[in-house]
């Protein structure tokens, strides 16, 4: 495998958090791409359009790489064994969710873009009827990954569900084991040999939101920054690296960047309201129909 055919992609909203995550992989000799202002499903199509990349490492800005060597070994394993995707089940493992385990949560994925492109079709993804194939797909799911609550009937948990359901039906997915961090929230993602690949903290959207505002919106999420910072420190300690420090100019750029991101994000959110409303009405009055 040639290194230049691998790229690391991150869908990012918070520049400060992104730079903390990027600091753990930006010197690996692999091109790094920050994707901003893209939808939760659209950025996978952006990766697939990048014909200079055969293997995409998709990592969230609140996921922190702890073992690059394990990551590269996993890439080799994925390619050599004909997998299209490797990642953490969205249910049944130690994500703070109980959703559909056939879908891999995109906080960390190895995506074999070269293989996926052999059948890639956006219309086929939209038209894929999971309910018709559900029982068959469940039979092929590794039961050893079902350690906690899950729900194979969930099909609309997130916008990226259609992509990953289609992917799991048409190609092989490697489902990785996970553990719960001692903080009670962070997911520790493992490879098949038990090495820790990354630490995913969740709730990145609350990282730089004032605590008083977070508590007003969601009283249970007011301590996220302190918890996430502790995990970032842990990841850098594991790697034997010094965490990035930011000066006044950096902090100003973070503020400007966030303002720009919100200016773009709000209209995007509003534009999807009619679609979400139609979707809710359709499933209320026609629950047997698929999207």
Question: What kind of feature is each model-predicted range?
Answer:
Residues 64, 68-161:
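Conserved catalytic core of nucleotide-sugar-dependent glycosyltransferases
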Residues 1-54:
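N-terminal anchoring/stem segment of glycosyltransferases
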Residues 53-64:
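Short beta-strand-to-loop acidic/aromatic patch adjacent to the donor-nucleotide binding site
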């Amino acid at each position: 495998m040639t290194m230049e055919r691998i790229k690391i992609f991150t869908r990012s909203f918070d520049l400060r958090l992104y730079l903390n995550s990027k600091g753990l992989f930006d010197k690996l000799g692999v091109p790094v791409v920050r994707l901003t202002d893209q939808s939760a499903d659209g950025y996978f199509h952006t990766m697939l359009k990048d014909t200079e990349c055969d293997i995409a490492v998709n990592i969230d800005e609140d996921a922190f790489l702890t073992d690059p060597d394990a990551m590269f070994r996993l890439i080799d394993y994925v390619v050599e064994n004909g997998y299209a995707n490797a990642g953490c089940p969205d249910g049944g493992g130690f994500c703070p969710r109980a959703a559909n385990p056939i879908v891999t949560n995109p906080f960390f994925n190895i995506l074999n873009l070269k293989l996926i492109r052999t059948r890639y079709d956006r219309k086929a993804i939209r038209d894929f009827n999971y309910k018709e194939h559900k029982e068959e797909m469940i039979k092929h799911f590794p039961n050893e990954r079902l350690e906690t609550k899950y729900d194979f009937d969930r099909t609309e948990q997130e916008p990226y569900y259609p992509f990953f359901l289609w992917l799991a039906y048409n190609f092989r997915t490697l489902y990785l084991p996970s553990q719960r961090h001692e903080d009670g929230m962070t997911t520790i993602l493992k490879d098949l040999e038990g090495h820790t690949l990354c630490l995913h903290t969740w709730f990145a959207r609350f990282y730089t939101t004032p605590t008083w505002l977070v508590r007003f919106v969601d009283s249970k999420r007011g301590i996220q920054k302190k918890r996430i910072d502790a995990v970032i420190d842990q990841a850098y300690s594991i790697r034997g690296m010094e965490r990035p420090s930011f000066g006044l100019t950096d902090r100003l750029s973070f503020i400007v960047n966030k303002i720009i991101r919100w200016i773009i994000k709000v209209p995007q959110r509003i534009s999807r309201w009619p679609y979400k409303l139609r979707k809710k009405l359709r499933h209320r009055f026609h629950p047997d129909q698929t999207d």
